[in-house]
Amino acid sequence: MERDTLFAPRLPDWRQPPATEWRDDSSLYYEGETYRERDTRVFAYFGLPQGHAGQTPAMVLVHGGGGTAFPQWVRMWNERGYAALAMDLSGRGPDGERLPDGGPDQGHVEKFHAMDEGLTE
């Protein structure tokens, strides 16, 4: 077995974008990772710089613990000439309420007690 294939991770095909459902022209839901054997959705804001044409540099804006998708971040980067995507990785929607198919919350229990559940392949 060649060295390059011995340690090659088995990753999904990242060239395929996740399934997406647009709410309006600046926000969307996209397919998240499977969590506890169920499909999840992620809410995000998206924006393009005014007058963009063709390829555009982009920023992916990931909030810290307890954060959310911040539309202000998207606008700030759009004003600087970047496409921007700000997602809510705590399983919440634009109103801050939990999505019925959102991923794990950002609370203490979800972050730290999940380690006690045991590992699976």
Task: Locate predicted features.
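Cytochrome P450 heme-binding "Cys pocket" and the immediately downstream C-terminal segment
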Residues: 1
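N-terminal cap/lid segment of alpha/beta-hydrolase-fold proteins
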Residues: 4-54
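Solvent-exposed loop/turn segments at secondary-structure junctions
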Residues: 35, 64-68, 91-94
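Surface-exposed beta-strand edges and their flanking turn/coil or helix-capping segments
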Residues: 40-45, 57, 73, 99
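Short beta-strand element of the alpha/beta-hydrolase
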Residues: 43-46, 54-64, 84
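Short, charge-rich binding segments
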Residues: 50-54, 67-68, 75-78
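Cap/lid segment of the alpha/beta-hydrolase catalytic domain
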Residues: 71, 75-76, 80-121
